[in-house]
């Protein structure tokens, strides 16, 4: 596997709304021997659905500034938010492919004494685990297989699309890489309706049309229940917020009584590696994960 070091891009939601997710990434990566180095001075990515849509140059300038920080560190970026991944990966890709974007980046960064030459890469947490570590290597770290758990795997949007800017060699229409990572833990990845549908939050929908966002999330949770899932597993802090906080909002709006445990991937992997729920920040979820932990026999 070799020595792995990354500039850790947190984004906004993970450290401010769900620090337990951040803790799970840090602790799992530490167990795997992967060093995460904090990016001092990093800002919002900024959000691909909102900022890119309304002020493209601002999106490019802020994103390029974040990329320049990692390049100054001499490290590839890793992030656990798919929205952040979408922004940083897209700007990195377009900087490489389009002179117009390179010119914008050069102009805006020159105003603050910075530059970006495209010498680093942008990776998602799942990308590092699947490609840099590898499924077979991960199996060596499993101490407590989660063999009685049925997981509804939620890929989300930005980790897959646009497909020409993503690294998934199997394609992005019906990928298996996330399912394979989930099944490393011993859990079963089940088939469920609308598996690849948006969580409801992205593209500014949660901010601009909460009722629409909650309707989409409600449908996904209903489908997860119908499939017999014990939990929904995600790999994006914004998707996590939408499923977790969104369930509370849905219950208030629709009079439902959803209590589907929402698990971020490194929380699931960490449990299988023998880390405690407290170490993985599972107690910080709004929707209790106790039913899942009881089924696993974890105190």
Predicted stretch roles:
Residues 1-299:
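Iron-sulfur cluster-binding electron-transfer modules in prokaryotic oxidoreductases
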């Amino acid at each position: 596997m070799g020595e792995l070091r990354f500039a850790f891009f947190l984004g906004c939601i993970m450290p401010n709304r769900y620090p337990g997710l951040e803790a799970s990434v840090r602790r799992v990566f530490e167990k795997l021997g992967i060093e995460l180095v904090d990016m001092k001075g990093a800002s919002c990515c900024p959000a691909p659905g909102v900022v890119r849509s309304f002020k493209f140059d601002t999106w490019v300038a802020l994103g390029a500034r974040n990329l320049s920080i990692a390049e100054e560190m001499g490290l590839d970026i890793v992030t656990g938010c798919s929205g952040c991944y979408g922004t940083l990966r897209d700007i990195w890709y377009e900087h490489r492919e389009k002179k117009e974007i390179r010119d914008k980046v050069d102009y805006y960064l020159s105003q603050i004494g910075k530059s970006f030459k495209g010498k680093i890469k942008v990776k998602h947490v799942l990308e590092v685990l699947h490609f840099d570590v590898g499924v077979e290597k991960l199996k060596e770290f499993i101490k407590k297989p989660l063999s009685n758990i049925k997981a509804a795997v939620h890929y989300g949007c930005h980790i897959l699309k646009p497909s020409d800017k993503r690294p998934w060699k199997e394609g992005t229409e019906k990928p298996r890489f996330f399912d394979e990572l989930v099944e490393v833990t011993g859990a079963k990845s089940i088939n469920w309706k609308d598996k690849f549908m948006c969580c409801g939050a992205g593209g500014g929908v949660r901010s601009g049309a909460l009722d629409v966002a909650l309707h989409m999330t409600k449908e996904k949770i209903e489908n997860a229940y119908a499939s017999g899932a014990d939990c929904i597993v995600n790999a994006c802090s914004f998707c996590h917020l939408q499923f977790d906080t969104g369930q509370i909002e849905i219950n208030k709006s629709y009079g439902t009584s959803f209590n589907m445990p929402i698990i971020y991937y490194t929380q699931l992997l960490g449990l299988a590696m023998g880390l405690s729920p407290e170490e993985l920040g599972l107690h910080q979820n709004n929707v209790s994960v106790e039913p899942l932990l009881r089924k696993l026999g974890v105190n």
